């Protein structure tokens, strides 16, 4: 079994995350940059973008999420929501992944035959970059979980960090030290997902 496949198998969703991180912020930043830069994109569009948050900026993001969800959540359910958000806030950092939409539009104009496909291909590219970053963090000893509070937080995030208008928020990858166990992976039967022909 290749080391790459072992890394894929080892990647899990860790929800109990902390600050006992051995890597420096610079090392983590380099790891994330390398993972995103070396992730393939259709037509070499390189449309994924990443904003890396540590410290106060990381905590600010989850304060924004909590504030955005409060008016949208029934009062009796909000304590559970607060507890969930607190678990993300307690982590070490967050990577926000964005799709750069001008690149997608330009490619649609250049290659009209495939115009309808470019938005889907851009989402695939974002997924690849996100999964590679997640796996790289896990291989470096950090746990992570993936959240999707967009578009509820889009405007507040853009204002707080001066995000360009052509960057569309797609996900939030929360990471930190592994402070608990991950749940067991469950898989559908292979015959539901794969077909092989000769």
Report each predicted region and the residues it spans:
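N-terminal amphipathic, basic helical "cap/leader" segment at the start of enzyme domains
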Residues: 1-93, 197-198
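Short, flexible, mixed-charge acidic loops at enzyme active sites
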Residues: 65, 107-112
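C-terminal edge-of-domain segments
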Residues: 90, 95, 175-177
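Short glycine-enriched loops at secondary-structure junctions
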Residues: 98-103
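Short proline/glycine-enriched turn/loop segments at secondary-structure junctions
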Residues: 158-165, 182-186
């Amino acid at each position: 079994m290749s080391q790459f496949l072992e890394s894929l198998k080892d990647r899990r969703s860790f929800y109990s995350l902390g600050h006992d991180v051995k890597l420096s912020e610079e090392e983590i930043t380099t790891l994330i940059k390398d993972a995103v830069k070396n992730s393939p994109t259709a037509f070499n569009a390189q449309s994924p973008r990443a904003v890396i948050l540590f410290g106060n900026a990381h905590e600010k993001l989850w304060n924004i999420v909590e504030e955005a969800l409060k008016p949208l959540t029934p009062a009796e359910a909000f304590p559970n929501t607060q507890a969930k958000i607190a678990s993300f806030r307690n982590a070490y950092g967050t990577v926000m992944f964005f799709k750069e939409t001008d690149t997608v539009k330009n490619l649609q104009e250049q290659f009209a035959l495939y115009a309808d496909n470019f938005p889907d291909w851009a989402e695939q590219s974002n997924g690849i970059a996100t999964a590679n970053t997640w796996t790289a963090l896990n291989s470096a000893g950090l746990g992570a979980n993936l959240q999707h509070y967009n578009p509820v937080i889009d405007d507040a995030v853009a204002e707080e960090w001066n995000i360009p208008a052509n960057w569309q928020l797609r996900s939030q990858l929360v990471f930190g030290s592994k402070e608990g166990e991950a749940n067991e992976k469950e898989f559908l039967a292979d015959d539901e997902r794969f077909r092989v022909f000769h």
